[in-house]
Amino acid sequence: MTNPVFERIQSEIAANPVMLYMKGNAMFPQCGFSARVVQILTHIGVPFHTANVLEDPALRDGIKQFSNWPTVPQLYVAGELVGGCDIVTEMYQSGELAALLAEKNVAHEVSA
C-alpha cells in the first residue's frame, strides 16, 4: 500500500535540490529553529523551497516518519537529509554546509 504523504515528500525532495520542511514559511517562520535555518540558507545565498508542516497535520507527522527524525525543521540537500537546526547551524559555522552544497553541485553564493 502506498503512502500519499511519503509520495508527496519524495516528489518534493526529488524536484528541489534544497528542500526545507519547517513550521511556517521562509517569509514568516513560526518557530525559532525554522527561522534560524531560513536565515542560514538565505545568508549562504542558496535557492530553497519550503513546505509548511503546520498547514497539514499529515505532513507534520509524515515527515518525521519518512526521515525517522523526530523534529522539524528538516533540511534536505540533493535528496538526502542533512538534519535539523542544530546540525545545520554547526555545518554552517564549520563551512561543511557550503562544502556539501558545492559537492552536490547546488548553486550558492558563499564558498567553503
Residue positions per predicted region:
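Non-catalytic, surface beta->alpha helical segment in thiol-disulfide oxidoreductase systems
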Residues: V77-E109
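TIR-domain catalytic/interaction hotspot
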Residues: E7, R60-Q65
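Flexible, polar/low-complexity N-terminal or interdomain linker segments that lie immediately upstream
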Residues: M1-Q10
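Thiol/disulfide oxidoreductase modules built on the thioredoxin-like
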Residues: Q65-T71
